[in-house]
């Protein structure tokens, strides 16, 4: 009987079944992100801006693969059809994100793939990126149980890309890079769902007795916010419209929201900045379907940003 249950699908987690359905309804593809109109915008970027966004998109492009490696490691600890099905869908979406980032990099580097690879090798030695990776690797090494590993995964999904999304969203404020802005909408919304899934995994698949203390969790969140802030601050000063103090405020507000999603009190009491560019991704937009695809999710999601 157990062997039959292993291979024959039956619903064993309603929450993850619903998340899987949400993913099915909102699947999108790289072909839906037109970048032709963005090509002329590349020359509008000054040298400082271009270097900043080359760095961000190279980091994001490589990070997608790392996320999938983490998912594979995490899944080995669960025996659930619905959890496996959902994360198979998430891994597929991460691959789509990686393809879109590759398309954007090809545009920024004028289709010189050799230069893209060389640049990617160079930034692996960047001090800001190294500090971020050292913190994460150290915490992963120290994680002694399932609950701690899920919390780290939750922070990666919810904190470690958000300052990049914020900075990319500023293109819309400048009125340039419409294709990149659409991609950022899609990807930021996917990450909303992924963060909700990680919180659901923690809330439903760990026992209270297995979870670390609140003090441990708060310390982890404070460290993650500070590491992510230092990362974007090291690269973002002097970039057009990038206000690192607003990004810190947004990181704190995001950390508070994630804490509440796992039934803990907020620690910062911060709200997103009034002019947060990611507000566009959570508001209802009037879409002209002759101009571009609709990036609004069909279902109702709690704003994870």
UniProtKB/Swiss-Prot annotation:
Pfam families: Ribonuc_red_sm (PF00268). The keyword Iron applies. It comes from the Viruses. Keywords: DNA replication, Host membrane, Iron, Membrane, Metal-binding, Oxidoreductase, Transmembrane, Transmembrane helix. The chain crosses the membrane at residues 150-170. InterPro entries: Ferritin-like_SF, HSV_RIR2, RNR-like, RNR_small, RNR_small_AS, RNR_small_fam. Its EC number is 1.17.4.1. The keyword Plastid does not apply. Its cofactor is Fe cation. It catalyses: a 2'-deoxyribonucleoside 5'-diphosphate + [thioredoxin]-disulfide + H2O = a ribonucleoside 5'-diphosphate + [thioredoxin]-dithiol. SUPFAM superfamilies: Ferritin-like. One of its GO terms (molecular function) is metal ion binding. Belongs to the ribonucleoside diphosphate reductase small chain family. Ribonucleoside-diphosphate reductase holoenzyme provides the precursors necessary for viral DNA synthesis. Allows virus growth in non-dividing cells, as well as reactivation from latency in infected hosts. Catalyzes the biosynthesis of deoxyribonucleotides from the corresponding ribonucleotides. This is Ribonucleoside-diphosphate reductase small subunit.
């Amino acid at each position: 009987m157990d062997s039959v249950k292993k291979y024959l699908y039956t619903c064993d987690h309603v929450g993850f079944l619903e998340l899987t359905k949400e993913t099915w309804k909102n699947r999108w593809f790289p072909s839906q992100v037109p970048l032709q109109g963005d090509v002329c915008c590349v020359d509008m970027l000054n040298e400082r801006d271009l270097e900043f966004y080359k760095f961000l998109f190279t980091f994001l492009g490589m990070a997608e693969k790392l996320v999938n490696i983490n998912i594979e490691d995490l899944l080995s600890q669960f025996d659930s059809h619905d959890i496996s099905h959902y994360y198979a869908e998430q891994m597929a979406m991460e691959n789509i994100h990686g393809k879109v980032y590759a398309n954007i990099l090809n545009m920024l580097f004028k289709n010189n793939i050799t230069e893209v690879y060389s640049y990617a090798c160079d930034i692996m030695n960047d001090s800001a990126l190294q500090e971020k990776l050292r913190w994460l690797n150290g915490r992963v090494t120290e994680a002694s149980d399932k609950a701690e590993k899920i919390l780290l995964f939750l922070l990666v999904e919810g904190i470690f890309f958000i300052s990049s999304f914020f900075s990319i969203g500023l293109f819309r404020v400048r009125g340039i890079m419409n294709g990149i802005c659409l991609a950022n909408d899609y990807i930021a919304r996917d990450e909303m769902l992924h963060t909700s899934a990680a919180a659901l995994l923690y809330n439903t698949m760990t026992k209270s007795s297995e979870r670390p203390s609140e003090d441990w969790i708060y310390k982890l969140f404070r460290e993650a916010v500070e590491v992510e802030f230092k990362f974007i601050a090291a690269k973002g000063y002097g970039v057009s419209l990038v206000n690192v103090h607003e990004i810190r405020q947004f990181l704190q507000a995001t950390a508070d929201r994630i804490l509440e999603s796992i039934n803990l009190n907020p620690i910062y009491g911060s709200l997103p900045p009034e002019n947060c560019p990611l507000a566009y991704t959570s508001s209802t937009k009037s879409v002209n379907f002759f101009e571009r695809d609709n990036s609004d999710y069909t279902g109702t999601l709690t704003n994870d940003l």
